[in-house]
Amino acid sequence: MASQSDLMELDMAMEPDRKAAVSHWQQQSYLDSGIHSGATTTAPSLSGKGNPEEEDVDNQVLYEWEQGFSQSFTQDQVSDIDGQYAMTRAQRVRAMLKHAVVNLINYQDDAELATRAIPELTKLLNDEDQVVVNKAAVMVHQLSKKEASRHAIMRSPQMVSAIVRTMQNTNDVETARCTAGTLHNLSHHREGLLAIFKSGGIPALVKMLGSPVDSVLFYAITTLHNLLLHQEGAKMAVRLAGGLQKMVALLNKTNVKFLAITTDCLQILAYGNQESKLIILASGGPQALVNIMRTYTYEKLLWTTSRVLKVLSVCSSNKPAIVEAGGMQALGLHLTDPSQRLVQNCLWTLRNLSDAATKQEGMEGLLGTLVQLLGSDDINVVTCAAGILSNLTCNNYKNKMMVCQVGGIEALVRTVLRAGDREDITEPAICALRHLTSRHQDAEMAQNAVRLHYGLPVVVKLLHPPSHWPLIKATVGLIRNLALCPANHAPLREQGAIPRLVQLLVRAHQDTQRRTSMGGTQQQFVEGVRMEEIVEGCTGALHILARDVHNRIVIRGLNTIPLFVQLLYSPIENIQRVAAGVLCELAQDKEAAEAIEAEGATAPLTELLHSRNEGVATYAAAVLFRMSEDKPQDYKKRLSVELTSSLFRTEPMTWNETGDLGLDIGAQGDALGYRQEDPSYRSFHSGGYGQDSMGMDSMMDHDMGAHHPGPEYPVDGLPDLGHAQDLIDGLPPGDSNQLAWFDTDL
């Protein structure tokens, strides 16, 4: 039974001038909400320390209260209490508070007592007197810390609605803090989450995100976090209430634990929702998130922030914004962090961003770290590192140079050797090697380095089963580049590269012919690769290999000339060009020139003299002249007239300028963009690492802007066309720099 001293203690706790008596449970510390401890928010508690107050202080306060009310109060005793405070309205209010508190403290499983206490507290929260409302809010907050009374509160929709309404409408800081704290305590339970949701608590909590009081902010964000994690419909409600904009605005705060919860809320809201990603972008989210990655060292914050960036990195609108904000460099700072989950998230995000970062400056540190990560024992790390390197070396002269200088060739070759038949690793690694072996100052060194580090056997092996078409396509392009180095001609031949290239060419050509005969008009995709691309790539690789006399003998011995002549009739200009190019090389040998003529090549070659692509026309002219070596002078003269009228049909002086011969194939290739939100690496079955949507032109790694032949393309003035050898001398030497397949992210 309660004594007079017990009642005095309760009365003192509620006096306005005695607020200090409960200040020890008003600490403004930060909330865990499951982020910092790793705990979930399932009932009965989200974490080991779910309240902002210290547990020992809580226990002390509740202990003191329980000491005073350890026995149940009878109705007579409650009536005595009422009698003592019946003189004024304020005294009656205090009496009502005591009555409600007594009932709630005694509440265990007695639904009748709860039913009697809750309406009284609810009425007080709705009182017009703000002093009364404040006292009620303080009391409800204190009671919400005790499990029994907390359940009584959450099971009353009227009470929860009153708490939400009071929090939203009050101008009193203490009232706002207590009501927000009460909702936070309720959010530890699924029943409480549902009650908050049904009472319209989410718009009210979003409104509180604009509070200037830190403790209110902490309660609001952690309660919203619990709702987002466990309450169905909460995500949409937060979006509709403008929560995304409010949360992005809070990213300029400096408390790392608060930021960790806020960024996790953003990740939950943005995942799988394009509209949310665009709202984050419009609110300045990318820059703020990158700033966090650049500024802080708290692992949990870096991890949650990297998760948001990972989700945003698959959005085509957010991707360039993150890159421009310095996202690549900021993420690269954490690739050597001891936290593997942070490293993996940064790598996934970098991989997603890398196709939009091919022109970024200041990537030296990142590239060096990525080359080191190729030696990791973690397959996911190696896979991502290879993919990022492939994209960053596409169309970027400086990045190619840097990767070569830090041992990238050796590291990539070793990666391919270690990967075996794991195409999610070998394909991006081969793509990166293809980029590094062409169109930069150290390209020849790179071509040699692949051989010196024992890479040729494994590269040729990848042309064979079980390799799938995306990997084969990348490998063919690499072999073409390796053939630019004369020292690789014999080793490639000895490894059996030529017969396999011919086999692939024949198979791909047959597939295209079969489709055409069946009335198909669109190009055929097999595992995300067009068979026309394989035809073009294999023919182009054979073209470069045919510079070697011994390779020409092997190529001719495989009965390829009829097929090359047939390819001259292809409706695809790129294929016409590589077919004319390989015939041009083969025609250096008299026997081959005769075989080419015997296959009826004169007619299609003569037709190609009128091609709008000057590269095609030039190769066709060269083949015709080589075929005419043993023809009568009269025939040569007529051919010279035909060539003159064809090749000089427009502006003859352009042949004396270092202009575009038309040997370029068109649009530049794009680096591969990752669009899946699943962090797992894209498999070749869904389109392959090398899938793109740019057509055959995208197989090249052109420089941005207008193309110019460059030092590998001396374009001399076309001499007297009556002399065959002079025409040959006027050709670009082997078309070494402008063939498709040699440098792109496939």
Identify the residue ranges that each predicted region occupies.
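Alpha-helical solenoid repeat architecture
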Residues: 44, 93-105, 120-124, 135-149, ...
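Alpha-solenoid helical repeat architecture
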Residues: 125-128, 167-171, 209-212, 227, ...
